[in-house]
UniProtKB/Swiss-Prot annotation:
Protein name: UPF0761 membrane protein VF_0100
Subcellular location: Cell inner membrane
UniProt key word Transmembrane helix: yes
Transmembrane segments: 34-54, 97-117, 136-156, 178-198, 207-227, 242-262
InterPro entries per UniProt: UPF0761_bac, Virul_fac_BrkB
Entry-linked PANTHER family: INNER MEMBRANE PROTEIN YHJD (PTHR30213), UPF0761 MEMBRANE PROTEIN YIHY (PTHR30213:SF0)
Keyword annotations from UniProtKB, A to Z: Cell inner membrane, Cell membrane, Membrane, Transmembrane, Transmembrane helix
CC per GO annotation: plasma membrane
Amino acid sequence: MEDKIKHKLRIGWSYLLFLKQRVIHDRLTVSAGYMAYITLLSLVPLITVLLSVLSQFPVFSGAGETVQAFVIQNFVPAASDAVEASLKEFISNTGKMTAVGSGFLFVASVMLISSIDRSLNYIWRVKKKRRPMYSFSLYWMILTLGPLLVGASLAATSYVTSLKIMDDEIVSSFYRTLLGWLPIILSFSAFVGLYLLVPNKKVRVTHALIGAMSAGCLFEFSKVGFAQYITQFPSYQVIYGALAAVPILFVWVYLCWIIVLIGAEITASLGEFEGWLTGKVSVNILESDIKALTEQQGLIESDSTDPESK
């Protein structure tokens, strides 16, 4: 019994060493910074495209503002009022753009989705790229069907709220509790979908669930920690004044991408490590074994910071 426990502890420690080596090799913080930069450039265009899709359907009138407020209040900790005001101002300015400018907004939105696709496929060591037509169809589907699904869920929520059964105290209390858990459920579902669907290779559901759970827990802890830091140490307001929302948003987006990529690294490394353990005969797993595994997987330091060049 004691030997089994020691063996499992060795396996767990070996996996952590392998994961650490993988994260260092992939330069996760550099990739997160790149993704944060692309996100900030594409955030307003993406939201504008999503809102414009919703505005084409009268049944979803007003849903765009509700989605925007919900996302900011539940996924941007602290200073949400300042961030929301800045985003609304930026988005309102896009209404003055010409057709050519609107086309550039769409291109910027696709650029963000393409960057996510490229970064995650690099983590999974996918060398075979999707066909351009397939990729374009996938991005188009995300930008069109995504807003419709969100709008439909909001409409369904409003309908359920208006039902007479909601007057019952027990049902109403359960419904409010469910709504309180909704942000956590949505973030977990988004992580699972991201880790299952984006890589251009088969990913085991159990691995995606573990990676999504890890990323979801980190995300919730980060929201609390970041909010505490912002409220307890508001030096950013003294330094930046009215522009304080910009660095707050940038730091938070950067932190979010670190969490997303850590979850992806966990999901991808589970498959590699599990396959390696299957062929391992000896019960003594040492650091030298991890070095051999990392060399086998090609985890050798590279001077390049571009995923496409590795």
